[in-house]
C-alpha cells in the first residue's frame, strides 16, 4: 500500500501544471469567468470552454496539447449548484478545474491515459488500490487500455450504459465516450460502486474525467467518425486535495480550513453545529464573489450581475444569522488573497474594488434585510414543518426587498418549509411580460427574422479601411423594410427617403465595434449617389452600410466607388487614441484595479466607463488630464502590431474580459515608460492616429457614477477642445461685460453677488416669518370661533415650508385653544400644515386631523399631536376644506 503525499492546494496546482508541461503540453492560463462571445453560457463552468473552437476545428489550434487550471463558476442556468453549497461535501459555486487537452492527434488516447495514471500514482503517490474506473458500456478499446496501462481487472473497470459516460456538445456536433477515475474513501463512508443504486452515497468520488471526442453527431440517428480527434480531461482540484490531505470533505482541505478560521475570528462564532453550514457558505461564496468581481462582473439586478448579487446576499444572510451587526465579507478579502493571490494575480490587482463592492453591497442589503425578514416571519409564523410558503410572498420578498428566491429558500430550509415555486415563477413571468410590453417595438419580429437569415448566410466583408479611405466594391445585398430587394430607385422613394442597408464584398468603412462609432461617407457610380449615414458590424465580420439614396438607382451586383468622410474618421481616430491614453493614465494614477466596463468613441466626444469604488476628485481628474496631455505633447508613435495572443498578454497587453480573441491579435502600443514597457498597450481592432501629437489636446468634461463601483469619464480631444476653449472664452467676455468687470475679477464679483443674495434671502425669510407668526391680538381679528376653539385658516404661495412649520409651531405654542391651518401652494403642489395648542391635544390632535383630511382629499402625510402636514396635488375639494375642518372641530 502506497503512502499518499500531503500537498497543499497551491502545491497540487503547480505540480499538475509542471508535470504535463514536462510531457509536451503548452500551459494556457485560465480564461476569464465571463465567456468570450458565448451568449449560451453565463459563466465558464469547465476547462474545455475556452477551447470550444478547437474542438470544432482542431487544425486551428497552435498547440496539439494544452494544460490548464481553469476558474469555474456554477451558479446559474443548467449548472446551478447554489442551493446545495454549504450543505454537502463537494458542491461549490466557484471551483478550480485541472485539465489537459489534445487537439487533432489521432493516437493520443493511450498516451493520455498513461500520463494521467502516472500522475496520480507515481507523481502524487495516490494508492492505486483505491482507484477504480468507469467506461461507456460499448467502449471496449478503453477498457482494454486500462487493463494494460493500470493492470486493472474487470471488477475495477465498471461499464456504464447511461449518458454519464458519453459526452456531447449538443444534439449535433462532436461527441464521444468518456472514462472516469474514482477514488475509494473507504468503507467508513456509506455508498456503492458507480452504476449501482447506492452510487450517490459518497464512498466512491470521481476525481478525473477523460472525454474522447472521436465522433460527430450529424442528426438524431447518424453518427460518423471525426477526421481529427480531440481529448478533453478534467480533474477537480478541491477533490484531488481531499485525497492528498487524507480528508473526505472538500471544506476540510487547507484552503477552506484557513478561510473558515478567518470567518471564526471575525464573527467570534466557532464553526460547529448549525454555524458550520454558515461558515462553509460564506467561505465558498467569498471565493465566487471575489473572482467574479476581479473578472469584471458588477452586482446588478439582471444577467451575470444578478447571479453575483444572489451569491453575495446568500453569504451576507449567513453573516446576519451569526449575529454580526457590521459588514464582514470585505474583511475576509485579505485572507483569501493570502491563499490564492499568488497564482491568481487579478485578486491582488482588483483588491480595492473587491473590498469596496463587498462592503457596499452588505451595507445596502442590511438596510432591507430586517424589513424582509419581518415580512417573512409574519407570513410564515403559522407554517409548520413540511408545509409550503406562498410563491406570491416569495416574489414580493424578491421584488420589494431584494431577496433572491434561493435566499428565502435557504432561510426556510432550517424550518423544513418549502416554497411554491410554480407561483413564484408565474409572478416572475408576469413581470417579465409587463416589461416586454414596455419596450416591444414595431416590426421587431421581422427584424429578428432578417438578422437570423443574414447570420445563416454569414457574408464576411473584407475591411480595407485601415490603410485606405477609398475603395471599389461590389454590392452583394440590399435590404429595406427588413426585406431583401433587387434595387433602390430614387424615383420610387417616398418623401421620407427611408434608410436601407447596403452590403459589399469589401469596404473602407469601419463598422461600429469596440466602442468606436461607424464611418460615414459617400458610395456612388455612374448610375447613383448614396449617402452613408452610419456603418455597423454584424456577427463580427459583416459590414452593413446604413444608407439614403441621393440620386439615381442602385442594383445588386453593381460596382461602386466607396469613400469615407476623412474628417469624420480623423476625429474618431483622435478620440480612440485619446481613450487608450486615458485608460493608461487612470491605471497609472488610480491603480491597476481599473477595468474597462464600456466605452464610446464618437465624433464629438468620448465616454469611458471603468471599475472604481469611489468618485474621482477634481484634483485627481486634473492630474489625469495633465498626464494625458503630457503623453500627447511627447508626440510618440502609435504603433500597430500583429502578434500571437499569448505573446501580447505576456508583454502586458490589456484585453477586455468579455471579448474572445483569436490566436493572432491586433495590438496598439503608445509611448514607453522608464522600464522599456509601453505606456499604453491594448488589444484593439479600431482605427488610430499615427502619433500622439496628432490628437492635439485633451479635456475631461465630467465624471459620474453609473452603477455601484462603476465611474464614467466623459472627455473631448482635438478640435473640440479648441471649440470649447473658444466658447468658454467668449462666455467669460460676455459675463465680464455684463457685470462691468475684467475677466480677472469675475470670481470676486460673483462671490459678492452670492453674499448679497444670501443676506437678502435671510431678510426675506424673516419678513415672511413675521407675516405668519401671530399674537393674541391678531387671533381676535382673524380667528373663527368653534365652541371654545379658535381656528385660523390661511392660504399662502411660494413660502419656504421650513418657515411655515416654524411659524405655525411657535404660534400654537404661545396661544392656547388654537388650531392653525396653513395651505402653502408651490408649483401646483399643495402642502397643508396644521398646528394644535398643547392644552387641547387631549381632545384634538394634529395627526388625527391629517388622517381625516387625507380620507377626504387624498395625498399623504403625518406628524405629531401638535404639528402635522399633508402633501397633495391641487383639487377643487380644497375649496371646501375649511368647512370640513370646522365640522371636524365641532364634533
UniProtKB/Swiss-Prot annotation:
Which Gene Ontology cellular component annotation is one that this UniProt entry carries? cytosol
Recorded GO terms, molecular function?
alanine-tRNA ligase activity; aminoacyl-tRNA deacylase activity; ATP binding; tRNA binding; zinc ion binding
Which cofactors is this protein said to need? Zn(2+)
Residues binding Zn(2+), per UniProt: 576, 580, 684, 688
Q: Supply the Gene3D superfamilies for this chain.
A: 2.40.30.130, 3.10.310.40, 3.30.54.20, Bira Bifunctional Protein, Domain 2, Threonyl-trna Synthetase, Chain A, domain 2
Q: What is its EC number?
A: 6.1.1.7
Which N-terminal stretch is annotated as signal sequence?
A: none
Cofactor, how bound (note): Binds 1 zinc ion per subunit.
Tell me the compartments it is located in. Answer: Cytoplasm
One GO term under biological process is: alanyl-tRNA aminoacylation
| Catalysis performed (reactions) | tRNA(Ala) + L-alanine + ATP = L-alanyl-tRNA(Ala) + AMP + diphosphate
Its chief place of residence is cytoplasm
Q: Which domain of life is it from?
A: Bacteria
Looking up InterPro entries in the UniProt record yields: aa-tRNA-synth_II/BPL/LPL, Ala-tRNA-lgiase_IIc, Ala-tRNA-ligase_IIc_anticod-bd, Ala-tRNA-synth_IIc_core, Ala-tRNA-synth_IIc_N, Ala-tRNA_ligase, Ala_tRNA_ligase_euk/bac, DHHA1_dom
Keywords attached to this entry: Aminoacyl-tRNA synthetase, ATP-binding, Cytoplasm, Ligase, Metal-binding, Nucleotide-binding, Protein biosynthesis, RNA-binding, tRNA-binding, Zinc
Question: What is this protein's function per UniProt?
Answer: Catalyzes the attachment of alanine to tRNA(Ala) in a two-step reaction: alanine is first activated by ATP to form Ala-AMP and then transferred to the acceptor end of tRNA(Ala). Also edits incorrectly charged Ser-tRNA(Ala) and Gly-tRNA(Ala) via its editing domain.
Family designation: Belongs to the class-II aminoacyl-tRNA synthetase family.
Q: Any notes on this protein's domains?
A: Consists of three domains; the N-terminal catalytic domain, the editing domain and the C-terminal C-Ala domain. The editing domain removes incorrectly charged amino acids, while the C-Ala domain, along with tRNA(Ala), serves as a bridge to cooperatively bring together the editing and aminoacylation centers thus stimulating deacylation of misacylated tRNAs.
User: What name is this protein filed under?
Assistant: Alanine--tRNA ligase
Amino acid at each position: 500500500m502506497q503512502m499518499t503525499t500531503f500537498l497543499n492546494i497551491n502545491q497540487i496546482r503547480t505540480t499538475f501544471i509542471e508535470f504535463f508541461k514536462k510531457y509536451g503540453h503548452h500551459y494556457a492560463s485560465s480564461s476569464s469567468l465571463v465567456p468570450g462571445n458565448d451568449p449560451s453560457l453565463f459563466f465558464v463552468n469547465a476547462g474545455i470552454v475556452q477551447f470550444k473552437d478547437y474542438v470544432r476545428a482542431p487544425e486551428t489550434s497552435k498547440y496539439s496539447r494544452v494544460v490548464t487550471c481553469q476558474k469555474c463558476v456554477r451558479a446559474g442556468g443548467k449548472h446551478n449548484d447554489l442551493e446545495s453549497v454549504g450543505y454537502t461535501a463537494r458542491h461549490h459555486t466557484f471551483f478550480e478545474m485541472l485539465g489537459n487537452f489534445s487537439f487533432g492527434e489521432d493516437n493520443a488516447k493511450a498516451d493520455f491515459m498513461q500520463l494521467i495514471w502516472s500522475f496520480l500514482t507515481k507523481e502524487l503517490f495516490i494508492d492505486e488500490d483505491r482507484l477504480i474506473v468507469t467506461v461507456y458500456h460499448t467502449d471496449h478499446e478503453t477498457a482494454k487500455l486500462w487493463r494494460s496501462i493500470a493492470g486493472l481487472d474487470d471488477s475495477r473497470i465498471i461499464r456504464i450504459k447511461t449518458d454519464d459516460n458519453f459526452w456531447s456538445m449538443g444534439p449535433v456536433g462532436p461527441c464521444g465516450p468518456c472514462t472516469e477515475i474514482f477514488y475509494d474513501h473507504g468503507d467508513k463512508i456509506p455508498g456503492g460502486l458507480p452504476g449501482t443504486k447506492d452510487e450517490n452515497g459518497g464512498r466512491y468520488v470521481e476525481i478525473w474525467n477523460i472525454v474522447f471526442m472521436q465522433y460527430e453527431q450529424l442528426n438524431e440517428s447518424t453518427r460518423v467518425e471525426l477526421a481529427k480527434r480531440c481529448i478533453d480531461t478534467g480533474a477537480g482540484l478541491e477533490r484531488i486535495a481531499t485525497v492528498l490531505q487524507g480528508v473526505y470533505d472538500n471544506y476540510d482541505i487547507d484552503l477552506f480550513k484557513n478561510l473558515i478560521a478567518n470567518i471564526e475570528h471575525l464573527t467570534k462564532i466557532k464553526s460547529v453545529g448549525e454555524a458550520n453550514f454558515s461558515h462553509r457558505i460564506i467561505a465558498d461564496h467569498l471565493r465566487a464573489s471575489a473572482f467574479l468581481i476581479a473578472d469584471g462582473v458588477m452586482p446588478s439586478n439582471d444577467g451575470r450581475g444578478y447571479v453575483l448579487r444572489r451569491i453575495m446576499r446568500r453569504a451576507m444572510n449567513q453573516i446576519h444569522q451569526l449575529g454580526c451587526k457590521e459588514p464582514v465579507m470585505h474583511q475576509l478579502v485579505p485572507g483569501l488573497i493570502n491563499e490564492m493571490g499568488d497564482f491568481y494575480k487579478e485578486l491582488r490587482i482588483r483588491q480595492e474594488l473587491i473590498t469596496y463592492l463587498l462592503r457596499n453591497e452588505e451595507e445596502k442589503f442590511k438596510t432591507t434585510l430586517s424589513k424582509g425578514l419581518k415580512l417573512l416571519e409574519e407570513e410564515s409564523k403559522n407554517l409548520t414543518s413540511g408545509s409550503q410558503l406562498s410563491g406570491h410572498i416569495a416574489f414580493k420578498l424578491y421584488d420589494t426587498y431584494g431577496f433572491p428566491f434561493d435566499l428565502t429558500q435557504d432561510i426556510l430550509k432550517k424550518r423544513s418549509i418549502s416554497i411554491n415555486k410554480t407561483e413564484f415563477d408565474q409572478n416572475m413571468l408576469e413581470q417579465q411580460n409587463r416589461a416586454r410590453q414596455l419596450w416591444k417595438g414595431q416590426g421587431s419580429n421581422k427584424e429578428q427574422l432578417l438578422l437570423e437569415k443574414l447570420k445563416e448566410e454569414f457574408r464576411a466583408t473584407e475591411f480595407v479601411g485601415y490603410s485606405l479611405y477609398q475603395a471599389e466594391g461590389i454590392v452583394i445585398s440590399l435590404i429595406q423594410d427588413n426585406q431583401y430587394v433587387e434595387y433602390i430607385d430614387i424615383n420610387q422613394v417616398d418623401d421620407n427617403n427611408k434608410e436601407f442597408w447596403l452590403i459589399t464584398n469589401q469596404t473602407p468603412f469601419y463598422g461600429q465595434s469596440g466602442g468606436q462609432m461607424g464611418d460615414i461617407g459617400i458610395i456612388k457610380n455612374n448610375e447613383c449617389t448614396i449617402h452613408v449615414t452610419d456603418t455597423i458590424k454584424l456577427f463580427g465580420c459583416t459590414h452593413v452600410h446604413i444608407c439614403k439614396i441621393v440620386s439615381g438607382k442602385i442594383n445588386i451586383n453593381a460596382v461602386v466607388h466607396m469613400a469615407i468622410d476623412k474628417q469624420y474618421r480623423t476625429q474618431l481616430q483622435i478620440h480612440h487614441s485619446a481613450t487608450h491614453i486615458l485608460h493608461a493614465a487612470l491605471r497609472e494614477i488610480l491603480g491597476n484595479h481599473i477595468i474597462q466596463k464600456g466605452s464610446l468613441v464618437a465624433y464629438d466626444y468620448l465616454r469611458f466607463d471603468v471599475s472604481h469604488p469611489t468618485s474621482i476628485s477634481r484634483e485627481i481628474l486634473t492630474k489625469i488630464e495633465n498626464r494625458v496631455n503630457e503623453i500627447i505633447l511627447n508626440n510618440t508613435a502609435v504603433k500597430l502590431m500583429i502578434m500571437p495572443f499569448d505573446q501580447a498578454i505576456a508583454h502586458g497587453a490589456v484585453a477586455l474580459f468579455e471579448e474572445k480573441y483569436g490566436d493572432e491579435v491586433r495590438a496598439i502600443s503608445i509611448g514607453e515608460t522608464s522600464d522599456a514597457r509601453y505606456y499604453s498597450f491594448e488589444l484593439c481592432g479600431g482605427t488610430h492616429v499615427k502619433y500622439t501629437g496628432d490628437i492635439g489636446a485633451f479635456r475631461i468634461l465630467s465624471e459620474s457614477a453609473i452603477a455601484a463601483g462603476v465611474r464614467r469619464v466623459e472627455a473631448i480631444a482635438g478640435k473640440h477642445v479648441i471649440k470649447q476653449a473658444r466658447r468658454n472664452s467668449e462666455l467669460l467676455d460676455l459675463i465680464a461685460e455684463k457685470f462691468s468687470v475684467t475677466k480677472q475679477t469675475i470670481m470676486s464679483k460673483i462671490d459678492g453677488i452670492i453674499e448679497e443674495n444670501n443676506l437678502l434671502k435671510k431678510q426675506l425669510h424673516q419678513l415672511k416669518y413675521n407675516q405668519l407668526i401671530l399674537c393674541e391680538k391678531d387671533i381676535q381679528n382673524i380667528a373663527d370661533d368653534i365652541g371654545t376653539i379658535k381656528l385660523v385658516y390661511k392660504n399662502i404661495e411660494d413660502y419656504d415650508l421650513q418657515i411655515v412649520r416654524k411659524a405655525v409651531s411657535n404660534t400654537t405654542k404661545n396661544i392656547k385653544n388654537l388650531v392653525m391651518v396653513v395651505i402653502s401652494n408651490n408649483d401646483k403642489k399643495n402642502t397643508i400644515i396644521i398646528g394644535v395648542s398643547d392644552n387641547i391635544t387631549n381632545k384634538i390632535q394634529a395627526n388625527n386631523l391629517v388622517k381625516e383630511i387625507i380620507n377626504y382629499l387624498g395625498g399623504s402625510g403625518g406628524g405629531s399631536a401638535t404639528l402635522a402636514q399633508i402633501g397633495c396635488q391641487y383639487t377643487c375639494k380644497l375649496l371646501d376644506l375649511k368647512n370640513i375642518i370646522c365640522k371636524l372641530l365641532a364634533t
